[in-house]
């Protein structure tokens, strides 16, 4: 059996420190947390920024980094920085490096980015490789190419490959 500890629905929403400690006592194989949600709408992805304040994100992330260190297991975040855009991933990576420097710790970090070039997506749309979801508004090449951030979904395969690097 694999034990995965999920301390909260998303980084930045807060978590119960006592529940986290109880979870660590159960010797998790992995601590995982989501960094965002589509519930917030497209604004954060469009701007490439996090919904949550840097200070609260840093405080929570530092606590989870410490928990993973004490548990001796990997820590994984999905959709870093609320939206998973490259700028938001870089923002969380910067926070991670700050926490490591401030605590004198080191860590092996795998960074998965899925930013897509709007021109490539537009070409795929034109050739029928990309299609709108049912009930989606009409789109065209100009609309696609005007997007500031387009990210692809990453499946378990990418995360598993990153974890396999040690």
Specify the residue positions occupied by each region the protein language model found.
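Metallocofactor- and cofactor-centric catalytic cores in central/energy metabolism, strongly enriched
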Residues: 1-124, 140-144, 148-153
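Core active-site phosphate/anionic-ligand binding loop and the adjoining beta-turn-alpha structural block
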Residues: 125-166
